[in-house]
UniProtKB/Swiss-Prot annotation:
This is Protein FMC1 homolog. One of its GO terms (cellular component) is mitochondrion. It comes from the Eukaryota. CDD domains: Complex1_LYR_FMC1. Belongs to the FMC1 family. Its main location: mitochondrion. Interacts with ATPAF2. Signal peptide: none annotated. Residues 94-113 are annotated as: Disordered. The gene is Fmc1. Keywords: Mitochondrion.
Length: 113
């Protein structure tokens, strides 16, 4: 993972992923225990004194790691739904998935002029 960015950006990203997760249920994401926990934890570690600095960095690192996990899972599911096989594909369908076209022969295989 590269640079962490700001804690506010990480919190916004986590809340965005919560919205994606709760879109299927129809419940507002603000009614979930995860939302309440995240907001409470980030508010508790908002203080910038030197004594709480290490705990704030640890919370931010764990939150950024969890955000990466949630995004990766969502993207994996989207890719899986798009490319998951529905049985055996024909050669034409497989070529179309990667943007290729097969050459066309006028009389089929073994055609001679």
């Amino acid at each position: 993972m590269a640079a962490l960015g700001s804690p506010a950006r990480t919190l916004r990203g986590l809340l965005r992923e919560l919205r994606y997760l709760n879109a299927a249920t129809g419940r507002p994401y603000r009614d979930t225990a995860a939302y309440r926990y995240l907001v409470k934890a980030f508010r508790a570690h908002r203080v910038t004194s030197e004594k709480l600095c290490r705990a704030q960095h640890e919370l931010h690192f764990q939150a950024a790691t969890y955000l990466c996990l949630l995004r990766s899972i969502r993207q994996h599911v989207a890719l899986h739904q798009e490319f998951h096989g529905k049985g055996e594909r024909s050669v034409e369908e497989s070529a179309g998935l990667v943007g290729l076209q097969l050459p066309h022969q006028p009389g089929g295989k073994g055609w001679e002029p």
